[in-house]
Every structure is written in C-alpha cells, then in structure tokens.
UniProtKB/Swiss-Prot annotation:
Protein name: GTPase Obg
Organism (species): Haemophilus influenzae (strain PittGG)
Superkingdom, natural source: Bacteria
HAMAP family membership: GTPase_Obg (MF_01454)
Residues annotated as binding Mg(2+): 173, 193
Amino acid sequence: MKFIDESLIRIEAGDGGNGCVSFRREKFIPKGGPDGGDGGDGGDVYLQADENLNTLIDYRFNKRFAAERGENGRSSDCTGRRGKDIILPVPVGTRAIDNDTKETLGDLTQHGQKMLVAKGGYHGLGNTRFKSSVNRAPRQKTMGTPGEKRDLLLELMLLADVGMLGFPNAGKSTFIRAVSAAKPKVADYPFTTLVPSLGVVKVDDSHSFVVADIPGLIEGAADGAGLGIRFLKHLERCRVLIHLVDIAPIDGSNPADNVAIIESELFQYSEKLSEKPRWLVFNKIDTMSDEEAEERVREITEQLGWEEDYYLISAATGKNVPPLCRDIMDFIIANPREAETQQVAPEEIKFKWEDYHQEQLAEYQFDDDEDWDDDWTEEDDDEDWDDDWSEEDDEGIEFIYKP
C-alpha cells in the first residue's frame, strides 16, 4: 500500500434547520395559537484515531466530506431532526491543521480518540418561542446558522520511541533489518529509503520499543535538496534520536562535517527537535580493524567537541548492536513518554439554547409596561380570529409561512 502522510481535504458541517411559522387550526378550537417547531441542529464532523490504519491514502482522491443538514421545524410543535454526524477514521499520530489560518486543531495519539473539527450550525426557532402575553400571534421565526466549513490539512506523524538520523547510505535501514522484523530496502546507492518505515525491537520477553527509519538527509535539505526535510516531522514524537554515522563514507567526505550538517538541518527544521536527546552511533566498523575504528572515531569526536557517550557498531554483522539496544530500552524505561495531549471529556449532549437564540428573541421582545392596549375598544373585541371558519372553508391553511 502506498504511504501517504499528508492530505488536504474539505470538510463541511451541516447547517442548522430553520424554525417554522405555524398556527394551530382545529375545529371548535378558535385562536389555537402558534405551534411552529424549532429546526434541528446541523451534524458535526469528527476525526477518530484508528490503530488499524497506517496511511492517509483514503483521503488522496476523496477530498470533500459534508455532514447532514438539520431538518426544518414543523407544525404541531414538531422539532426538526438533528443532522447526522460524520466520523473520519485516521491513523494514530495524525495532526489536524486549519489550512487557512495554520492553526493546529489537535493531535490524535491514542486509539479511539475523537476530535471535533467542524461544528454544525444551531437550529432556528419556531414562532412558538416568541409568544407572550403581549404577542399572542407571533409571526417571527429564526433561521438556522451555517455549519463550519474549513480546508483541513491532515499530517501523519509516526509514533515511535526511537528515530534514526543520518546521511544516505549511513546504514539506517540495515540497522533496522538487524534489530527487528522490518525489511526496508537496502542497496549501495543513495536514497534507497524513500518513505519512513517502522520496526519493533524486542529486547526481551517483556520489553520492546519502536524505531522509525526516515530517508537520509543531505546538505541543503531545509531548502529542498534531496528528499527535503518533510519526513523529519515523523521524529517529533520520538524520545531519543539515534544519529548513525558512517565512519568510512564511500564518497570520501569527512564524517565530522556530515554530523555537523545533520545538526544544522535539524535546527533549521525545528529548534525543539534539535534539542531532543541524540546519541552518536558510529557504524561500519567492520570495514577496518578495531584499532583503526577507535582512532577514527576519536578524531571525529575531537573535531565535533563531542563530550557525551557514543557507540561503535556494525549493523551488517551485528557487532555491539545488542548492548546498544539494551541501553536504548533502559533510557526509554527511565524516560516515559509525556502526555502529548490532554484527554478531552466527551462533549455533553444537550439542547442548544445559546446566546444566539437569546439575542434573536430579544429582537422581538415587547415591554410589558408599554400601554399597548390603551387604544382598545369594544369593537376590537368583536374582531375574532377567523370565527366564521368551517370545514368547508378552503382558505384555512395550516402554514402561514413555510420554510
């Protein structure tokens, strides 16, 4: 299956249903009064993390997703049905970004975690809501509000404990093949690895960790050289970075300069990522004697001014690889993953009587102290509501305004 770690989609929440203007019309019930119902709320759009997915390929061609609109209100005080929500499944580790404002809406880092990304519109109010002692035959209603619409950028960021860094052909894929069941392609030319891959390293019966391999970086990657730095985002959630260094590059370059280039590209991408714990692991010591390897590594660390610990391994032969894996496991146990996001409590489902509705009602409020009936006369009392109505009256209709 093709690995897709980024997709731009259009999401549209449902509009709220409109309120209804209606009056009760029944035989022997004069002046039935208003009975127009409220509309239904529009459907919401959610993202939900699914551990069974590992790519965003489902959103490569299908780009538009719209929730259902709320139904309009009806007579007899019938409220319109709420629009159906839509839930879009995404891989664990997906980040949602508003493409217009560049605002990060949230990260989905746990299986089953759900996130609201577009809110449905509020329902409109029927004329029943506007009746009062001074407004007994209201002909007002409100319209439903539009649902949220946005262009949503989905970014998949792999969840791994350990991230591999290094120049092309440093031996990253060979290392993963040696310590896990993952089988990334290995060849003697640069950029053999084109997409990130994951491997599970089992240290013993009860301990294991996940390692991520990304395509190699070269000088100028921040400006788009090589495969660029687009895959560095997959290392943002790693707890430790393993910087694999070829102590005998086939192109004759200086390993110390190669390390400095990677450090510079990391910093240009993200200062936070450059500050993560990073271990230097010198690979391919099988290409020379132990004495030569130790002397070469000593020269490299002196040029770098590296004062922390480092490792000498051969990913091809497995030499010194098990001790490195055990040290990584000890580090992971001693440094548990910090919570990426706070688990949001499920949204309380309630009838949405919000400020929007209060404002709409306020526009039609009448002051009870107003002398609205000072000009009343006995003649007005004779002006009844359709007193001459009968079953043969074809002009009697139920809806005065039909949305």
